Swiss-Prot record:
Domain (ATP-cone): residue spans on this chain: 49-139
BP GO terms, sorted: negative regulation of DNA-templated transcription
Function recorded in the entry: Negatively regulates transcription of bacterial ribonucleotide reductase nrd genes and operons by binding to NrdR-boxes.
Cofactor: Zn(2+)
GO molecular function: ATP binding; DNA binding; zinc ion binding
Assigned protein family: Belongs to the NrdR family.
Keyword Lipoprotein listed: no
Record PROSITE patterns: ATP_CONE
Entry's cofactor comment: Binds 1 zinc ion.
Name the record gives this protein: Transcriptional repressor NrdR
Length: 160
């Protein structure tokens, strides 16, 4: 693997261990040229997924982009990062197991909403405000009412 510091092509693995219940391999690497140390993670990717956007264009699925959007929703909440990582892995496995090469962005948003609903109400509301395109305070009030009644409707923008 290429060194992220000096771009040397052949770094050495110093330590490997399974994480996330064996679903991921964490590797500590060192560059023999500059001495830079860094960590890589190796995951199984069952298939290449494409995301069809609302605009009609398609782009490759980006796990890191999904992680960033969830991290924004859970920012400043006391949630274990490993728990979020497991939730993201579950969402990705769910997408891969659908067997569809192209997945609507709405479907991904729906799966994230379902995951966040079980993790943290505030994160759920934050994500919903973007996913459902909230326009005013009453939109927040509606989703809070749904949560308090235990009937959060994550399908308002998604038709299965």
């Amino acid at each position: 693997m290429r060194c992220p510091y000096c771009q040397y092509e052949d770094t050495q693995v110093k330590d490997s261990r399974p994480v996330e219940e064996g679903a991921v391999i964490r590797r500590r690497r060192v560059c023999p040229v500059c001495g830079g140390r860094f960590t890589t993670f190796e995951r199984v990717q069952l298939r290449e997924l494409l995301v069809s956007k609302k605009s009609g264009r398609c782009e490759p699925f980006d796990r890191d982009k999904l992680m960033r959007s969830v991290e924004i929703a859970v920012r400043k909440r006391n949630i274990d990062p490993d728990y979020i990582e497991r939730a993201i892995s579950g969402i990705v496995r769910g997408l891969e197991s659908l067997g569809e090469p192209e997945i609507a962005s709405e479907k991904i948003g729906h799966l994230v909403m379902e995951a966040l609903k079980s993790i943290d109400d505030i994160a759920y509301i934050r994500f919903a405000s973007v996913y459902r395109d909230f326009r005013n305070a009453s939109d927040f009030h509606d989703v809070i009412d749904e949560l308090s009644k235990g009937i959060a409707n994550t399908e308002s923008c998604f038709d299965e």
